[in-house]
Amino acid sequence: RSRGLGDVYKRQLMNNMNKRTFLSLLLCVCCLSFLHAERVDMQQAGADVQGRKLNTALINSTIDRLNAHGGGTLFFPAGTYLTGSIHMKSNITLELEAGATLKFSENFDDFLPYVEVRHEGIMMKSFQPLIYAVDAENITIKGEGTLDGQGKAWWTEFFRVLVDLRDNGKRNINKYQPM
């Protein structure tokens, strides 16, 4: 039985409508996924904003929770947030408002246990970096806030160890890396 032009036209129209419907649904799903991404105000979540108490556990547990739900943003309003190593995961944003400071601890114990890192092309075990990620993607750090790595404490210890090694020939140079 032969088909008329009307049948062919109806079939093409249905195919085009199915494609448009599919693309419209896909666009809606994409938009909804962005709307669903949670934004956590770290001050409201209970973080100390005076820089006196460590917020490491709260920051990292918030990252874990957001990551388990597909991602989100940790928002740091103005204040000082003392922390150890921050373990980033996929689809996480750290947003620091102007006047917000992530102040990394001067206590080396807050960057343990050692993790595998690359230094000048050589893989080694060392302290956890200030912000650390493994097998993660779509990570963002944004805003007008400050990341304060407390570099003076780290350089002071580094040079103390070098001087001890040079002057005294010590091999067990600190409690972290006995040689």
Model-identified regions with their sequence ranges:
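Small/flexible residues
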Residues: 3-5, 21-22, 168
